[in-house]
A protein has these predicted regions:
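Extracytoplasmic gating/loop element in the C-terminal half of outer-membrane beta-barrel translocons
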Residues: 221-224, 237, 357-361, 378
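Short, small/polar-rich motifs associated with maturation and membrane association
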Residues: 1-308, 322
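Flexible loop and strand-edge segments within Gram-negative outer membrane beta-barrel domains
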Residues: 196-198, 242-279, 283-287, 299-374, ...
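Eukaryote-specific, cytoplasm-facing alpha-helical/coiled-coil scaffolding segments in long proteins
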Residues: 214-216, 338, 418-428
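Outer-membrane beta-barrel pore domains and translocons
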Residues: 188-192, 279-281, 327-329, 400, ...
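Short loop/turn motifs that connect adjacent beta-strands in outer-membrane beta-barrel proteins
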Residues: 178-183, 270-271, 286, 319, ...
C-alpha cells in the first residue's frame, strides 16, 4: 500500500487476503461475491514476553537470547506519574534501582538513583547514562513523552562493552523517531495538586511560655515569664511585646499546582521520517507572598521548563541511514532572595513569641527578640527574589551502514555530538 494505506490487488473469489504489519495483529479477509472495496483496521498486538525486544549495548536483541541482567522498563507506566521530573518516577517502578529525593523545592526536586547500590565500584557510584547512544550527565530535564524505550544494564556481561564507566550500571534510553505514513499529531495536558506530606505543628504563644517555664523549673532555673506576662500573652492585649504568631500558617500554603503539556508529531515517507515535540512543565511554590508589593515582585518559589526535540531519519541508500537530532530545554527557577533553605531554617527556629510580623506602627522587625535569627516573614518576602535561567542544547549526528556484504548482521555506526550549556543568575531587590 502507499503511505495513506490505499492498495490495489487482483484476486479471485473465495481467496483470502492477509494483511500483516510488524507490531499489529494479522487480519485475514475471505473475498466473496463482487466485492471491490475492502477496508480493514489493524489493532496493535501485545508483544509476547518471549519475542520482546530489549535494547542492549550492542543494539536490539530478543529477550529470549539475552543472558545478562537487563531490565526493560515499561515507559507507559512511568508516564502515569504526575511529576515534573522524570527521575522521580523511577522510584518503586524499576527493579534494582535505589532512588533518593533530597529536596522538595521546585526545580530541585530531582532524585538521585543507583543501579548497583550506593557503595559501589570506583570513586563515583552513579550509573552511566546513554540517550540515543550519547553519554549524558543526567536525565533530570528529559521529557518523558519523548522516550521510546528505557533499559537498565546491571551485571558485568551486559555492561562490559562500556568498560570501567559501566561498572555501576548503564541506563540506555532511546527517544522516539518518525514512522512512514501520514502525519500523526498527539497532544496531552495534565494538572495536579501537590500538598505537604509532613509539617511540624507548633504550639501557640501561651502554651510555649507555660512549657518553657516548666522546663526551666525542672532544671532549678527561674521561670522565663512571670504570671502577669502570662496573662498578657493569653489575652493578646500587647501584640508588639507578646505576639502570638502562627508562622507556618502565615508563610506556607496548603498546596500548589503543577502543570504538564506536550504536543508531538511524526510522519514521513520511505526515504525520510521525522519526529518533533514541544513540552511545557510548571511547578508552583508553596510560599505566601506580600500582597502589598508590586505584582511582578514574586518571591514565591516556582519552576518552569520548556523542552523541544527534533529527530530526522534519512535513508541515503537502502543500506545507509543518516540520523539527525537536536534537543534541549530552557528552564527558569524562582526563589526567595536568601534562598529556600534559609526560609525553612528561620521558620523552624522561630516560636510564636519570638517576634510580631509587624509592629502596630507598621514597621517590620528584621530580627526576633533575644535571637539572631531573621524574622521568617522578612526572609521569605522582603529580601528580594532570585531568577536562575538555564539553557541546554544537544545536537547529534549518527550514521549507520549495513555491511552484510562482508559479514551478515555486521553494522558500522558513527556518532558525532555537540552540546552547549549556559546559565544566568539574577537577583532582584
Amino acid at each position: 500500500s502507499n503511505i495513506n494505506g490505499k492498495y490495489s490487488i487482483k484476486i479471485q473469489q473465495y481467496q483470502t487476503l492477509v494483511f500483516s504489519y510488524i507490531g499489529f495483529k494479522t487480519v485475514s479477509i475471505l473475498v466473496k461475491g463482487d466485492t471491490k472495496v475492502i477496508n480493514i483496521k489493524m489493532q496493535e498486538e501485545k508483544i509476547n514476553a518471549v519475542d520482546e525486544v530489549v535494547v542492549t549495548g550492542l543494539g536490539k536483541q530478543k529477550k529470549l537470547t539475552i543472558t545478562g541482567a537487563i531490565t526493560n522498563v515499561d515507559v507507559d507506566k512511568l508516564r502515569k506519574y504526575p511529576t515534573s521530573n522524570f527521575t522521580n518516577a523511577l522510584a518503586g517502578n524499576v527493579p534494582g534501582i535505589i532512588t533518593m529525593q533530597s529536596s522538595g523545592q521546585p526545580g530541585k526536586n530531582t532524585s538521585r538513583f543507583w543501579v548497583r547500590g550506593i557503595s559501589t565500584f570506583g570513586a563515583s557510584s552513579d550509573a552511566m547514562i546513554l540517550v540515543d547512544g550519547f553519554e549524558r550527565p543526567n536525565i533530570d530535564d528529559l521529557n518523558i513523552e519523548d522516550i521510546e524505550s528505557f533499559s537498565v544494564l546491571k551485571d558485568a556481561s551486559a555492561t562490559a562493552i562500556y568498560g570501567s564507566k559501566g561498572a555501576n550500571g548503564v541506563i540506555l534510553i532511546t527517544t522516539k523517531h518518525g514512522k512512514a505514513g501520514k502525519i500523526n499529531i498527539t497532544a496531552k495536558g495534565e494538572t495536579s495538586y501537590n500538598t505537604r506530606t509532613i509539617t511540624p505543628k507548633f504550639v501557640d504563644a501561651y502554651n510555649y511560655a507555660t512549657l518553657l517555664n516548666e522546663a526551666r523549673i525542672t532544671r532549678n532555673l527561674a521561670p522565663q515569664y512571670q504570671p502577669e506576662e502570662l496573662a498578657l500573652i493569653k489575652s493578646g492585649l500587647d501584640p508588639d511585646f507578646y505576639p502570638n504568631v502562627d508562622w507556618t500558617n502565615l508563610l506556607l500554603k496548603d498546596g500548589a499546582m503543577s502543570y504538564r503539556a506536550d504536543i508531538n508529531l511524526n510522519g514521513g515517507g520511505n526515504t525520510a521520517r521525522y519526529f518533533a515535540s514541544l513540552a511545557y512543565v510548571e511547578d508552583q511554590g508553596m510560599y505566601n507572598t506580600d500582597e502589598t508589593l508590586r505584582k511582578k515582585y514574586n518571591t514565591n518559589a516556582n519552576y518552569k521548563r520548556w523542552n523541544y526535540r527534533m529527530n530526522l531519519d534519512i535513508d541515503i541508500t537502502p543500506t545507509t541511514i543518516l540520523k539527525l537530532g537536536i534537543s534541549g530545554n530552557l528552564n527558569k527557577r524562582n526563589s526567595p532572595g536568601l534562598g529556600d533553605q534559609y526560609v525553612w531554617g528561620e521558620l523552624f527556629g522561630f516560636n510564636a513569641l519570638s517576634s510580631p510580623v509587624r509592629y502596630s506602627n507598621g514597621y517590620i522587625p528584621a530580627y526576633g527578640r533575644n535571637t539572631y535569627q531573621m524574622n521568617p516573614w522578612v526572609s521569605a518576602t522582603q529580601t528580594g527574589y532570585n531568577q536562575e535561567w538555564n539553557n541546554n542544547i544537544q545536537t547529534n549526528i549518527t550514521i549507520e551502514q549495513q555491511l552484510d556484504f562482508l559479514i551478515k548482521g555486521l553494522t558500522f555506526t558513527g556518532r558525532f555530538g555537540y552540546d552547549t550549556y549556559n546559565s544566568n543568575y539574577i537577583h532582584h531587590r
